[in-house]
Amino acid sequence: MYKRQLEYPEIREYLDEHIEKDWVDLVYAGKTIVQRGKEANDQINILGDDGVPVEYHERFWKSELIDFVILQQDAFDDIDANCPMERQQMMYKMVLGICNQEFAFADFEACSQFFKGLINLFRQMNYSEWKSEKFEGYRKQIEQYVSEQSK
């Protein structure tokens, strides 16, 4: 889909009806997180890891979470390559929910470690059959992992 197509009322109506009401708003929310993450990364590259507040690192890693979990798929894995829309919706909303939370990190290294661990859990979840025990196990692990770090 071209980036401006989401602005067309007909596209919005179609997505509201066939995917979920206000789906376009959720897409824009994710897009904004990714854009803010790129901006934060630019500042980190200019000023250095210690030259910016931890919040910049958090913003960057939230965008990486969307990138690694939602935007990238493993075409060589049958499960990840063939992801039903219901699963995509659930995963996207789960990732957005995490991105909308506030966390308390001691420093940028703690932030980086947390998000790398989270991305790894989501990747394992992506390789698990939809609604299987393994899938649900990873979902619970992710929820626990996030709740331990939340403010």
Question: Where are the regions that the model predicts?
Answer:
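Conserved catalytic/coupling modules of large nucleotide/cofactor-utilizing molecular machines
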Residues: 3-151
